[in-house]
Amino acid sequence: MSTDDGRRPIRRALISVYDKTGLVDLAQGLSAAGVEIISTGSTAKTIADTGIPVTPVEQLTGFPEVLDGRVKTLHPRVHAGLLADLRKSEHAAALEQLGIEAFELVVVNLYPFSQTVESGASVDDCVEQIDIGGPAMVRAAAKNHPSAAVVTDPLGYHGVLAALRAGGFTLAERKRLASLAFQHIAEYDIAVASWMQQTLAPEHPVAAFPQWFGRSWRRVAMLRYGENPHQQAALYGDPTAWPGLAQAEQLHGKDMSYNNFTDADAAWRAAFDHEQTCVAIIKHANPCGIAISSVSVADAHRKAHECDPLSAYGGVIAANTEVSVEMAEYVSTIFTEVIVAPGYAPGALDVLARKKNIRVLVAAEPLAGGSELRPISGGLLIQQSDQLDAHGDNPANWTLATGSPADPATLTDLVFAWRACRAVKSNAIVIAADGATVGVGMGQVNRVDAARLAVERGGERVRGAVAASDAFFPFPDGLETLAAAGVTAVVHPGGSVRDEEVTEAAAKAGVTLYLTGARHFAH
């Protein structure tokens, strides 16, 4: 019998949980309300050990637990009680004829499959943690939400006790619980299917791009808005992935915005493109400045900021090492939206916290590799993340097209400029000197304009500097622009039908020119 709002009293509960958190309190509350509890294995033992009345499921089924616990609840006397739609008189009559009672509440959580995989367990141990009976019970109860409520998370137990006091769950509440239950099962199944695909049955030769692709995310936070105030937005995290910015700890400041996250992600990745101590300053997903230093992180930040102080105002800063007090003192004099680092030296956070609004994050080092997803109309593009690990990213594999071989200092700057170029939106030209960008031309629809922009931003600092281009020069004009401004050495992928003309222009200008054979477009 249910009320006008579909509230159905709870008389009988089936409980089978791996995670015993809150179990005893839940069982005590159910028992005190007169609810009959049927349970399985270790769950039943935990309840019984506290003196709470509980019926073992094998007593209900008349069939023992077998096959090392693989079969406990896969029985008609269980699933008929889960699936009977009590709105239908014929279902109620069938239960009565069979001597089966319905369950109004099912509390189940599943074997820890993902945690077992993450622990490095053997294949057999992982397979053993693929739950069968649990998902079957959850799906059955969720399907039958007009008659039963299902709870899969210990955080929901307080809601069960509240519903008991109110006379049961309403239909609307059972619908919500059913939705959560199916989400839980879907996430679990995706984890199992993905692991099976990658570990037991990889496809060849395109194992990285299988016929089926599944992934699940959980909402971490609601954001004030998206890129613009009229766009709603939220942050989601992948619970199975290496911890990243979505899991970063915020130590100080206002809540992160959508744009804060996109810029912080670009800055974080740019800083870790370099092995030396590095600081990247990002605005609208493009670098205002990137610099490395063998002296200190404060020195790297100073050099990065000097590249374009005007654009760095309101920027996002990332460091690939601990932020020192000295760097924090400098940052505190500049309007900065976000700073993210693997850690902060004693006293550095106190200095940064003088600024009420600066967002201070600490995050784990980004994991190399992985895939990038980009939605398009009607589908999704997936590609391997662009890492600086191509054959041509190693300067030992570069080809000297013209000019004298670069001396060690010049070659070091060329390597830095080449690696910094990956973080710049195409078409990209980076001019660098002394381990720092001095002029960045980004996001232009032709390469000569990118060169002009980089030269304009670099000013007098361009003379004697080096430059990198993320893709080949399609015409000599881009290289000629750099040479005319005083650039002495350039590195680019090569591969244009006009490579010979570009090389001739470099030779004529006395510019050393290297070819990498690798490209780093970023759109």
UniProtKB/Swiss-Prot annotation:
Look up the record and report any one GO term of the cellular component aspect.
plasma membrane
Can you tell me which family this protein belongs to? Belongs to the PurH family.
Which example biological process does GO assign this protein? Answer: 'de novo' IMP biosynthetic process
List GO molecular-function terms, semicolon-separated: IMP cyclohydrolase activity; phosphoribosylaminoimidazolecarboxamide formyltransferase activity
**UniProt gene name:** purH
Q: What is this protein called?
A: Bifunctional purine biosynthesis protein PurH
User: Which InterPro entries does UniProt cross-reference here?
Assistant: AICAR_Tfase_dup_dom_sf, Cytidine_deaminase-like, MGS-like_dom, MGS-like_dom_sf, PurH-like
**What highest taxon heads this organism's lineage?**
Bacteria
Q: What is the lineage of its organism?
A: Bacteria, Bacillati, Actinomycetota, Actinomycetes, Mycobacteriales
Q: What start and end residues bound the annotated signal peptide?
A: none
Q: Which NCBIfam families match?
A: PRK00881.1, purH
Q: Which residues form the MGS-like domain?
A: 1-152
Q: Write out the pathway annotation from the protein's UniProt entry.
A: Purine metabolism; IMP biosynthesis via de novo pathway; 5-formamido-1-(5-phospho-D-ribosyl)imidazole-4-carboxamide from 5-amino-1-(5-phospho-D-ribosyl)imidazole-4-carboxamide (10-formyl THF route): step 1/1; Purine metabolism; IMP biosynthesis via de novo pathway; IMP from 5-formamido-1-(5-phospho-D-ribosyl)imidazole-4-carboxamide: step 1/1
